Every structure is written in structure tokens, then in C-alpha cells.
From Swiss-Prot:
It is a peripheral membrane protein. This is Photosystem I iron-sulfur center. Its main location: membrane. [4Fe-4S] cluster 1 binds at residues 11, 14, 17, 58. It comes from Crocosphaera subtropica (strain ATCC 51142 / BH68). HAMAP family: PSI_PsaC (MF_01303). It comes from the Bacteria. It catalyses: reduced [plastocyanin] + hnu + oxidized [2Fe-2S]-[ferredoxin] = oxidized [plastocyanin] + reduced [2Fe-2S]-[ferredoxin]. One of its GO terms (molecular function) is 4 iron, 4 sulfur cluster binding. InterPro entries: 4Fe4S_Fe-S-bd, 4Fe4S_Fe_S_CS, PSI_iron-sulfur_center, PSI_PsaC. It is found in: Cellular thylakoid membrane. It is an enzyme of class 1 (oxidoreductase). Its EC number is 1.97.1.12. It holds the Pfam family Fer4_7.
Length: 81
């Protein structure tokens, strides 16, 4: 099941989220918008299982990466009304 993975421009290019992902959903790509000259990208969101390890690994104050779980996952986890 794929989930929406959103990477914000607050990404500092540290690679923590890429290393934390157990399914290699994320990768770093060149980007001139930060000091590291790279930013996380999510080319394989269809492989995302929604574990949110990437969110946990993100060191920025405002999480630079967010995983938005689909309605079916939210319901099966008992998070829906």
C-alpha cells in the first residue's frame, strides 16, 4: 500500500531519513536550495509501508519529511472515528 510522502524545503540534506527507511523508498537528489546541495526525494512511494521511521529520524525542528497515511491504514490502526 502506498502512502503520500511529502518532503518540505526545510530539508537540510543530512540523509538521516534515507538511512532510516527500511524499504529504500527515499533517495538523495542534487538541489541547490540548501548547504548540502542535496535534498531527500521519494521516487518509490508505492513501496512505503507507513512506518514513519523517516519522520522520527529527521533532525529539523519542523519535520522536513512527512508520511500521510491513507484512509484504509488509519482505519485499520484504530485512528479513525
Amino acid at each position: 500500500m502506498s502512502h503520500k510522502v511529502k518532503i518540505y524545503d526545510t530539508c537540510i540534506g543530512c540523509t538521516q531519513c534515507v538511512r532510516a527507511c527500511p524499504l529504500d523508498v527515499l533517495e538523495m537528489v542534487p538541489w541547490d536550495g540548501c548547504k548540502a546541495s542535496q535534498i531527500a526525494s521519494s521516487p518509490r512511494t508505492e513501496d512505503c509501508v507507513g512506518c514513519k521511521r523517516c519522520e522520527t529520524a529527521c533532525p529539523t525542528d519542523f519535520l522536513s519529511i512527512r508520511v500521510y497515511l491513507g484512509a484504509e491504514t488509519t482505519r485499520s490502526m484504530g485512528l479513525a472515528y
